[in-house]
A protein has these predicted regions:
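Helix-to-loop junctions at the C-terminal end of transmembrane segments
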Residues: 123-136, 349-364
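Intracellular terminal tails of multi-pass secondary transporters
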Residues: 1-83, 107, 250-285, 371, ...
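Glycine-rich segments within core transmembrane alpha-helices of 12-TM secondary carriers
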Residues: 196-228, 236-242, 431-445
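Extracytoplasmic gate region of multi-pass secondary transporters
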Residues: 92, 290-355, 410, 414, ...
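Extracytoplasmic
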Residues: 72-107, 123, 128, 178, ...
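Structural signature of the two symmetry-related core transmembrane helices
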Residues: 139-153, 367-382
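Short hydrophobic/alpha-helical segments at membrane-entry points of transmembrane helices
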Residues: 160-168, 180, 230, 303-304, ...
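Conserved MFS/SLC helix-loop-helix module at the cytosolic interface between two early adjacent transmembrane helices
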Residues: 122-162
Length: 526
């Protein structure tokens, strides 16, 4: 299935004589002139690209190198991103096995326990993105995974509400870098056309690992040896696995394409040239405050932030309360865990469907932001509308599973920041804003579920319905805006997809750390 992605990659072998002349002039100005343009280039990858910018790479070379990259980094990123989700979901399993009773917390206190994680996440998000901008993304991913493991061990010592609040807050701080780090990391290794498939692959790891660890939690829930509570065993297993994974990645997760030891010198050049074509650069540590001002003025920032906020209100509520909502269908606590397994199939399965179509069709991103929300809205409408009726129990359960279709849009929402925004400072700032919206939405979500509404949580479901509708409108609005902007740029500056010299100019502007507004040859994907 990966091989067929080459239908997307365009060969750069043929250029017109005029285009070639323009290319030579550009390269000459970088290498043999007064080095004025070279001094403007901030990207760390330029060292390996110097002298090779105008050299074409064949689709066969690109495919061969991409395969090696896939096998090396995708399994590790999928595992770490899946563990990131399971760490949060573990709280809902722990509640099923009497966490609330054992440490004496009530329903409203549990809402605060769910939300406090995202207060830590919120406070740490901007510093986390600054650190990602300055340091090796791969090492940051390894370190935060190790820290998760230590903090999950800390859950075993929790004796009361205050202790749980403290450990969940610190866990939120430690997880703040992971989403932005994964976005940046994939952007450092893959072309724009390849990124959505990879995002969907590793994001599906959340659903996949959720299914696996739901079964693990089911088994651990039957352990009653007296040394630990059942819910403590869940945190113990996850802690050990997080530390093992973080340690392994420290040695085997590569940094940048230009520094990858598992590639030959020529393959490192190919890997770097592939990503340079994104016109976003690869790695720049220079911080430019002017780009922050531009991000604040950019309408795309507000589309992305609002979409993330409204999509995370359902996520924040359902991640922590889904087992409680499902138990209102009159299942036992063990049945609830098993019946909840298809909940993840509806997200992970849809991600793979979108990934499959993404191989054959370009520009599915806006559809990926809206269609999963429509499916989720239909499922929620059925659950909400049959609440007091005599509808078939399993029909309602199926509709409930449909609600998690909304999770299939999350990889697209995260990926859009890296693909619509150029300029490393602007991208870091926008990532921070989007992930702050992620945290705020997840904070708001649990408070939609009031204890007085249990077990059906009617008002919470109505709120979530409104959030799904808002996401559909915002996603469609973003698509209309970027289509209009692309047409405007093509009219004013020409189409870089039809003129190789314009495309090369755009690549060089990206290496200079120009923003998407400054780089007139940058085109938005949709």
């Amino acid at each position: 299935m990966l091989d067929k992605e080459e239908n997307i990659i365009k060969s750069n072998n043929s250029t017109s004589s005029n285009e070639k002349q323009h290319v030579d002039v550009t390269v000459e100005s970088l290498e043999n002139g007064d080095d004025f343009e070279e001094r403007e280039i901030r990207d760390k990858a330029y060292k390996i690209l110097k002298g090779h910018i105008d050299e074409a790479i064949t689709p066969e070379e690109s495919k061969r190198v991409r395969r090696k990259i896939d096998w090396r980094i995708l399994p590790l990123i999928t595992l770490v991103y899946g563990m990131n989700y399971v760490d949060k979901a573990a709280l809902s399993w722990a509640v099923m096995f009497n966490l609330r009773k054992d440490i004496n917390i009530d329903g409203n206190q549990y809402s605060w326990v769910s939300a406090i994680f995202y207060f830590g996440y919120l406070g740490a998000e901007y510093p986390a993105n600054f650190i990602i901008h300055k340091f090796s993304v791969s090492k940051i991913i390894c370190v935060v995974c190790l820290v998760w493991g230590v903090l999950l061990f800390g859950h075993l010592g929790v004796k009361n509400y205050a202790g749980l609040m403290v450990i969940r807050f610190i866990l939120g701080v430690s997880e703040a870098p992971i989403s932005a780090a994964c976005i940046n990391y994939i952007g450092e290794w893959y072309t724009k056309d390849e990124q959505p498939f990879r995002f969907l692959c590793f994001a599906s790891g959340q659903g996949g690992l959720y299914i696996i660890f739901s079964l693990v939690a089911y088994g651990l829930g039957h352990v009653n040896d007296g040394s630990l509570y059942s819910w403590q065993y869940i945190f113990l297993v996850l802690a050990c696995l997080s530390i093992i994974l973080g340690t392994y990645m420290w040695f085997f997760l590569p940094t940048l394409p230009s520094e990858a030891k598992f590639l030959t010198e020529h393959e490192r050049l190919i890997a770097t040239k592939r990503v340079a074509g994104n016109m976003t650069g690869i790695k720049t540590i220079y911080w430019d405050n002017k780009q922050i001002i531009e991000a604040i003025k950019d309408p795309k920032t507000y589309f992305l932030v609002l979409y993330m906020f409204f999509s995370m209100i359902p996520n924040g509520g359902l991640t922590n309360f889904n087992t409680l909502v499902l138990s209102s269908f009159n299942f036992s606590k063990y049945e609830t865990i098993l019946v909840n397994l298809p909940w993840s199939f509806f997200s992970a399965g849809q991600m793979w469907v979108w990934a499959f179509f993404g191989i054959y069709f370009k520009n599915l991103r806006i559809l990926g932001l809206t269609i999963p929300m429509i499916i989720a809205m239909i499922g929620l409408a059925i659950v909400y509308g049959t609440e007091n009726g005599n509808a078939d129990k399993w029909g309602r359960v199926f509709a409930y599973w449909m609600i998690n279709s909304c999770s299939a849009s999350f990889p697209y929402a995260m990926n859009m920041t890296g693909q619509l925004i150029s300029g490393h400072t602007k991208q870091s700032f926008t990532n921070s804003a989007v992930l702050i919206a992620f945290a705020v939405g997840n904070i708001v979500g649990p408070f939609c579920f009031n204890a007085s509404d249990a077990p059906k949580y009617t008002h919470a479901l109505a709120t979530i319905m409104g959030c799904f509708a808002a996401c559909i409108v915002i996603g469609a609005g973003l698509g209309i805006y970027i289509l209009w902007e692309n047409k405007r740029r093509n009219k004013l500056y020409g189409n870089p997809e039809e003129d190789e010299s314009l495309k090369l100019e755009g690549i060089i502007e990206g290496l200079k750390d120009k923003t998407d507004t400054e780089n007139h040859h940058f085109r938005y994907v949709y």
